[in-house]
């Protein structure tokens, strides 16, 4: 049975013709008892799937992911079973609510009870188009993992753009080695 991720990936691959990579796919567990595994693992809802560009050069692979409005401390990157995973959480900025609360605290007096009630009213957003919550993006490196030197992984996060660079292993095709027979 196809999951929603399989369907989205097939649509994405048809539109972008990038069959080597996928957005995010549930990894199957090797554990035979899936019910216990389901209960023990903390499963997070994915609210955001960030945009990603992958560039392969002669010397390295460059992965650029848009993570605007996300703190560096809320981003987690790892590679497991040849899958690069970028995940974390985009939190709501509560500065406006805090400013409103500080303003209402300053205006409180004993003889102004109606004013206190007015200041306790919640504000209402006029327009809200931004997304908040958990994000996750996976990249299958299986087809090129043998070419990569994972000890050279570097990441840089600036102006909402996460750039991960992995150098390729030095080219051994031009070198010749003599192999001794024992």
UniProtKB/Swiss-Prot annotation:
Transmembrane segments: none
Domain of life: Eukaryota
Disulfide pairings: none
Keywords attached to this entry: Stress response
InterPro entries documented for this protein: A-crystallin/Hsp20_dom (IPR002068), HSP20-like_chaperone (IPR008978), HspG1-11-like (IPR051779)
Domain sHSP: 43-182
UniProt cross-references to Pfam families, sorted A to Z: HSP20
PANTHER family: HEAT SHOCK PROTEIN DDB_G0288861-RELATED
Annotated family: Belongs to the small heat shock protein (HSP20) family.
Protein name as it appears in the record: Small heat shock protein hspG1
Organism whose genome encodes this protein: Dictyostelium discoideum
Lineage: Eukaryota, Amoebozoa, Evosea, Eumycetozoa, Dictyostelia
């Amino acid at each position: 049975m196809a999951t929603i991720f399989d369907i989205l990936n097939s649509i994405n691959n048809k539109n972008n013709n990038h069959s080597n990579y996928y957005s995010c796919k549930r990894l199957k567990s090797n554990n035979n008892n899936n019910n216990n595994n389901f209960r023990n693992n903390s499963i997070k809802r994915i609210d955001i799937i960030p945009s990603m560009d992958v560039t392969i050069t002669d010397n390295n692979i460059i992965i650029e992911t848009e993570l605007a409005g996300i703190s560096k401390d809320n981003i987690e990157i790892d590679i497991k079973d040849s899958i690069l995973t970028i995940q974390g959480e985009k939190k709501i900025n509560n500065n406006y609510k805090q400013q409103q609360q500080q303003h209402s605290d300053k205006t409180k007096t004993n003889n102004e009870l109606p004013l206190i009630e007015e200041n306790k009213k919640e504000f209402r957003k006029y327009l809200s188009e931004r997304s908040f919550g958990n994000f996750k993006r996976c990249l299958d490196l299986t087809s090129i993992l043998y070419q990569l030197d994972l000890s050279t992984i570097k990441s840089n996060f600036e102006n909402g753009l996460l750039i991960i660079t992995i150098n390729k292993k030095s080219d051994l095709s031009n070198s010749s080695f003599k192999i001794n027979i024992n």
